[in-house]
Structures are given as C-alpha cells and as structure tokens.
Amino acid sequence: MAIAFQDVNTTSLGAITSDLNKAARPTVLVFDSGVGGLSIYQEIRQLLPDLHYIYVFDNEAFPYGEKSEEFIVERVVQIVGAIQQKHPLTIVVIACNTASTVSLPALRERFSFPVVGVVPAIKPAAKLTRNGVVGLLATRATVNRSYTKELIEKFATGCRIESIGSAELVELAEIKLHGGKVSPDILKKILKPWLGMKKPPDTVVLGCTHFPLLAEELVQILPDGTRLIDSGVAIARRTAWLVKHQNNLVCTSADSLAYCMKVNTDTDALIPVLQEYGFSKLEKLIT
C-alpha cells in the first residue's frame, strides 16, 4: 500500500486565526474547470478558516485538458472578470494545472489583485525520491506542456520521470465527488505502466487538482511505500502569506458561495457536497 504525502515541508499545521473582524473578511476566489479545485480550497480553508471564499467551476467547458490554450485563456479571464464585478476580490487561486500553465500571465496583466497558480510538484518530488524514479500523474495536456518539461529539466535532471497522462482519472474524481464509486480495476488499468515495472516510481506527483480526491483509492493500488505529493499545502501557505501582506483589504460579511457555468442534474447533486465544504449555495454565473 502506498502512503499519502503532500508537501516536502509539511509539519503539523494548525489553523491561522485571522486578526480581522470575522464579520468582515477578505475574499479568496478558487477557480477550476471542475470540482478538483476543492482539494486546493480544502487546504487553504484549513489554514485560513476565517476568510470569505468563492468557488467557481466551469462545468460548461469541462474538461480543460482537451481545449486550446487560446480558448482557456479567454475563458478564464472572462470568468474571473465576471466574479470581480460581483465581489471584491483579495486573491484569486487558479486551482487547475492546465489553466495555470497558460492563463497566469494574462490574468496578472488584466487584474491588480494577486493570482496564484498550481503547478506539478516536481521539485519536492525530486528531493524526496529514494530510488530516483518519479511518477507524474496528470492530464495528457499537462504531461505534454512545455512548462512541465521545463520544470523537469530545472528541478529533476537527476531523476527518471515516468509520466501517465489520463483524462479518465479526472472523470473518476468527478464521479466520486458526486457520490459514485471508483472501480479499482479501472485504476489498475490506468496505472498498469507503473505496476509492471521492476523499478517503479517511489514518489508520485499528483499533477491535477482532481487527483488528491482519489488518493485513498490510489494508495490501495500503488506499491507499498509510494509517496503521493500534491501542491495543496504549498498553495495554502502562499495564499496565507499574500493575505497577511495585502494592503487596503476590501472585506465582506457575505456567506461563502459557489458558482457554476451551467445548471443541470449533476450540479443539483453537488449542492449538499458543496454545503459540506462550507458554501451556503450554488448559483449559475452569468458572464
């Protein structure tokens, strides 16, 4: 059985109690194409429980992995702009590896608030591996992007990187969050290239924010001692630092809420899940 492991510098992190008046809190927007960004939101909220959160998922264009870079950039900028018209934003977290690798420059040029992105945790994985073999589990788009290859060249030149690109894992994570069951046989089929290796990865980077939602299932299938690493804790720490060092915070007393881009039976089924995550309601975003 594998072991779940999230951050090379992880210690026992307690929640940071805000010095701000709890009736007036700065707003953090967490954005993803689907529900995978909830794994990032969960880490941020654990560290900063007193903030006002907005979660937006673009279920109309989900998944982003198969979309063009131009489409993603235009889409993300448009959605963030629509939220800005409704809420005073302190920080935006793009909790999607695919969107982060292509849209951050455009977002930072357009908006004045800080924008935090998510990238595969190649650097800590390269430091943690014991056998020199690191697995990258991500979407095909993330695996093939030049940005990911640059991370590998910069931080993991002494390692062998074994990559698996899978859109099916994204769908499985969505199914799980909607209350469905994940088939171990399907996971074994996806992970088959690693399971048959004489020297498989001992450290696996979860390079999509959906994949931590499947950590429980993945550790049952990967070899004993395999470490799973994602970027959640690092993103939470970065967000906490930015909140602390922001000037002229515009605060709100509103409840945390979620937005989607289209409403259907799937989003109806998500409402109780989102409420468990602390969101008072789910609305359709009009752009």
From Swiss-Prot:
Pfam assignment, any one: Asp_Glu_race
This protein's record includes keyword Repeat: no
Gene Ontology terms, MF aspect: glutamate racemase activity
Gene3D superfamilies assigned: 3.40.50.1860
Record field: catalytic activity: L-glutamate = D-glutamate
Pathway(s) per entry: Cell wall biogenesis; peptidoglycan biosynthesis
GO biological process: cell wall organization; peptidoglycan biosynthetic process; regulation of cell shape
Uppermost EC category: isomerase
Stored InterPro entries: Asp/Glu/hydantoin_racemase (IPR015942), Asp/Glu_race (IPR001920), Asp/Glu_racemase_AS_1 (IPR018187), Asp/Glu_racemase_AS_2 (IPR033134), Glu_race (IPR004391)
Similarity comment: family membership: Belongs to the aspartate/glutamate racemases family.
Function, in words: Provides the (R)-glutamate required for cell wall biosynthesis.
PANTHER family registered for this protein in UniProt: GLUTAMATE RACEMASE
Protein name: Glutamate racemase
Originating organism: Photorhabdus laumondii subsp. laumondii (strain DSM 15139 / CIP 105565 / TT01)
Lineage: Bacteria, Pseudomonadati, Pseudomonadota, Gammaproteobacteria, Enterobacterales
Gene that specifies this protein: murI
